[in-house]
Amino acid sequence: MKFLLLVLAALGFLTQVIPASGGGSKCVSDTPGYCRTHCHRGETALFMCSPFRKCCISYSFLPQPDLPQLIGNHWPSRSRNTQRKNKKQQTTVTP
């Protein structure tokens, strides 16, 4: 009976200590992030909830940047440069 009372007391204490939302409260109602002291892997801090807590948002919720499309190869290939060097060496070596 004492053991059962001890278990119930421990469970009651744990419900007060462990947060139900997985480590943090929601940042803002329209933001899909949580206020935490450290962000998990795969998350980034968008802004500060309080002086010690960051609003951590998963990378999957962030917009992807629009990168410019590259046309063609802007850098000369290494094989082309080595061909030029080989031609120069052949012309200087031959008497």
Curated annotation (Swiss-Prot):
Keywords: Antibiotic, Antimicrobial, Defensin, Disulfide bond, Secreted, Signal. InterPro entries: Beta-defensin, Beta_defensin_dom. This is Beta-defensin 132. Disulfide bonds join C27-C55, C35-C49, C39-C56. The keyword Nucleotide-binding does not apply. Has antibacterial activity. The gene is DEFB132. GO terms for biological process: defense response to bacterium; innate immune response; killing of cells of another organism. Its main location: secreted. Belongs to the beta-defensin family. Residues 1-22 form the signal peptide. It is found in: Secreted. Residues 72-95 are annotated as: Disordered. GO terms for cellular component: extracellular space; sperm head. It holds the Pfam family Defensin_beta_2.
